[in-house]
Amino acid sequence: MKIAIPKERRPGEDRVAISPEVVKKLVGLGFEVIVEQGAGVGASITDDALTAAGATIASTAAQALSQADVVWKVQRPMTAEEGTDEVALIKEGAVLMCHLGALTNRPVVEALTKRKITAYAMELMPRISRAQSMDILSSQSNLAGYRAVIDGAYEFARAFPMMMTAAGTVPPARVLVFGVGVAGLQAIATAKRLGAVVMATDVRAATKEQVESLGGKFITVDDEAMKTAETAGGYAKEMGEEFRKKQAEAVLKELVKTDIAITTALIPGKPAPVLITEEMVTKMKPGSVIIDLAVEAGGNCPLSEPGKIVVKHGVKIVGHTNVPSRVAADASPLFAKNLLNFLTPHVDKDTKTLVMKLEDETVSGTCVTRDGAIVHPALTGQGA
């Protein structure tokens, strides 16, 4: 079987869905690996390194994709309306595995059905123990949380750790993290390593212990409401108006003392909740920084702008998009390993063919299109 990895064409995307290590694993499984020329440049992965691992380099995307049985990408393929029609380049009946953004990008899903492409949206991977090694959201969010702190430290005009000198003492930076998921936990850990005093808030009561285990202080809002603020899949629920008001009041007491606020709160399939209002920004210290990791989903702060750094009311608000791509050299191998871990159990060792087992919940939970039809319950109206 042939597996192809094209160059990512969406603006600002430096990641690639392959690494030399994963090429070797795929070859060992019986795959012929075809990578588009220059696909790994943004992630510091050279064509020579991929060739040495066993891959074949194709000069164009069309050459790489035209005969491939399986296609790996980081982001969803582009449609004709977006410019280069990547969907049309994929062989009819092929298998696609990528971050499809299926719940919010219906046009590309419909375009895939027309070519009878079996598409797996890796962002829909079930939150079960067995699937942790396949979870692209966790691997990429972890790096985003790290990078958020580094970006915050860069934009902040002061030092992070406390420094005692003959000329005086420099106080430690105060960091406030909103949302204690994978990104939030890594942000807490990284900020603590840099010497900051770290506070954190989340609607889920279970995150309090996690925050404290990393040396942070948890801001409690409403104990009773927080006990039911988590979905069966482990995600945060959208909270009511009364809770949000209480949360804003509790957080504001810390926000006025905060140097760097990092917001990471997302609700699957819905706009990001507003956690820092414009009124709250006006009460922050001059020179403080907000890093909004949810800017692509509408933002946790309404003043953040996708892809821009703006200054409002004396506060610098950073809206970098696609933050994992800012750590592409580490993000790419992890993404590729997630895809490999998803694919490997379904390769028949005797025939060297890919047979996706539909009874496997990692398969049924991520399969969006099959046999020319949209099959995922969240898109057919049969489930959430």
Curated annotation (Swiss-Prot):
Taxonomy, superkingdom: Bacteria
Span of the signal peptide: none
Annotated keywords: NAD, NADP, Nucleotide-binding, Translocase
GO molecular function annotation: NAD binding; NAD(P)+ transhydrogenase (Si-specific) activity; NAD+ binding; NADH binding; NADP binding; protein dimerization activity; proton-translocating NAD(P)+ transhydrogenase activity
EC annotation from Swiss-Prot or TrEMBL: 7.1.1.1
Swiss-Prot/TrEMBL GO biological process terms: NADPH regeneration
Catalytic activity reported: NAD(+) + NADPH + H(+)(in) = NADH + NADP(+) + H(+)(out)
Residues covered by region (RQD loop): 126-136
SMART domains the UniProt entry points to: AlaDh_PNT_C, AlaDh_PNT_N
A single Gene Ontology CC term: plasma membrane
Residues annotated for NAD(+) binding in this entry: 127-129, 132-135, 180-182, 202-204, 234, 247, 266
Protein family membership: Belongs to the AlaDH/PNT family.
Biological role: The transhydrogenation between NADH and NADP is coupled to respiration and ATP hydrolysis and functions as a proton pump across the membrane.
Oligomer status and interactors: Heterotrimer of two alpha chains and a beta (PntB) chain; in Rhodospirillum, the alpha chain is made of two subunits (PntAA and PntAB) and forms a dimer.
Protein name listed in UniProt: NAD(P) transhydrogenase subunit alpha part 1
Organism name: Rhodospirillum rubrum (strain ATCC 11170 / ATH 1.1.1 / DSM 467 / LMG 4362 / NCIMB 8255 / S1)
Gene, per the UniProt record: pntAA
